[in-house]
Amino acid sequence: MFITFEGIDGSGKSTQARCLADHLEGRGFDTVLTREPGGSPGAEEIRRLVLEGDPDRWSAETEILLFTAARRDHLERLIEPSLGAGKIVISDRFADSTRMYQGLSRGDLRGLVDTLHTLMIGREPDLTFIIDMDPDTGLARARARGGGEERFETDHEQAHIII
């Protein structure tokens, strides 16, 4: 089974994914906890490319291609092999985040995101939990924890307006 958690930054996706993995492992299930962007060595390299440096160095289209490449590597090297081995895969983010942030917040590129997903990924989660919360609260929590993902806060704020 492939389970994903989606929601804005600071909504508790990582915490809830970890709690679910711990709960299932405590009941004897073999689980794999992962994240996007990233989750495999190649996808982590792409994550660094996107998160570090000048945020305007990539066009929206190039960024979509990078995220799709990272997801493809993640799918090939971790998700599919784990599912094939009978494990439950729990991911902090997957394609819905790309559909929202790159597909809508950086222009009307949803069609491109969907086409690339169909061609290169071709998999949807079996179950997605969407964590809904006040955007201001989530962003405040994300900023308070720090880390290297401030690069997307502006895009995420714009996405909240679109929603």
List the predicted regions and their residue ranges.
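Hydrophobic alpha-helical packing residues
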Residues: 20, 24-25
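The start of beta-strands in P-loop NTPase/AAA+ ATPase cores
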Residues: 1, 87-88, 127
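Walker A (P-loop) phosphate-binding loop of P-loop NTPases
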Residues: 10
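Conserved lysine of the Walker
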Residues: 13
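Hydrophobic positions on the alpha1 helix immediately C-terminal to the Walker A/P-loop
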Residues: 16
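Hydrophobic anchor at the beta1->P-loop junction of P-loop NTPases
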Residues: 3-5
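A glycine- and Lys/Arg-enriched "phosphate-lid" helix/loop adjacent to the NTP-binding pocket
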Residues: 98-163
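ATP-dependent small-molecule kinase phosphotransfer cores
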Residues: 27-121
